[in-house]
């Protein structure tokens, strides 16, 4: 399903009123689903109502890495309110992608997140940027992540802009 990633519209999603207008415009131009990300602070129930009122659905979200690590139960509960079964991490701390040790730490933590989300009927993906194309031991950091994630259910959001920017 093709939808609008709302990060691009983040200037217009910082209040519930602005979000309602942005969602109405997204629906008006022909989309049926969104990826929720970078919204201003507002109750998830209000966001869910605004989405439903426009006839849209939330197909996916981006959740900050610190929240996934420390507030995963809340993240799951919020996704239930949004009727959304998929989240991705939009950005990880730089020490994660600057070394293979950082990758190994990420994988260890991501396995726990994948398992808990999976037990709740949800899936999880990694959204990359250009810096994951740095090479370590002859392969890009992202290729190393692909290789080690074969034995657990980590998805990947391939961003064509960042693929080109990363030189792949």
What are these regions (language model features)?
Residues 1-86, 155:
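N-terminal pre-domain/capping segments
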Residues 5-9, 37-39, 63-66, 92-94, ...:
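Active-site beta-loop-alpha junctions enriched in small/polar residues
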Residues 17-21, 72-73, 102-111, 138-143, ...:
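Charged helix-capping and loop-helix junction motifs
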Residues 34, 118-168:
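Acidic/histidine-rich catalytic cores of soluble enzymes
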Residues 44, 97, 134:
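Glycine/Thr-rich phosphate-binding loops of Rossmann-like dinucleotide-binding domains
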Residues 53-54, 82, 113, 119-120, ...:
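Helix C-cap/helix->beta junction micro-motif
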Residues 70-105, 109-110:
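Glycine/small-residue-rich loop that forms an oxyanion/phosphate-binding "nest" at active or ligand-binding sites
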Residues 109-115, 147-148:
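Histidine/acidic residue-rich metal-binding segments in metalloenzymes
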């Amino acid at each position: 399903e093709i939808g609008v990633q709302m990060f691009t519209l983040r200037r217009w999603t910082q209040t519930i009123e602005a979000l309602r207008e942005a969602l109405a415009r997204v629906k008006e131009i022909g989309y049926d689903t969104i990826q929720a990300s970078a919204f201003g602070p507002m109750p998830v129930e209000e966001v869910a109502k605004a989405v439903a009122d426009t006839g849209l659905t939330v197909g996916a979200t981006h959740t900050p890495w610190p929240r996934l690590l420390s507030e995963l139960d809340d993240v799951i509960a919020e996704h239930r309110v949004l009727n959304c079964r998929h989240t991705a991490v939009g950005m990880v701390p730089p020490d994660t992608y600057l070394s293979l040790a950082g990758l190994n730490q990420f994988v260890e933590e991501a396995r726990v997140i994948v398992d808990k989300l999976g037990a709740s009927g949800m899936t999880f993906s990694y959204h990359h940027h250009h810096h994951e194309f740095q090479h370590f031991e002859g392969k890009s950091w992202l290729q190393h992540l692909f290789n080690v994630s074969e034995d657990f259910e980590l998805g990947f959001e391939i961003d064509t802009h960042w693929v080109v920017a990363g030189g792949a």
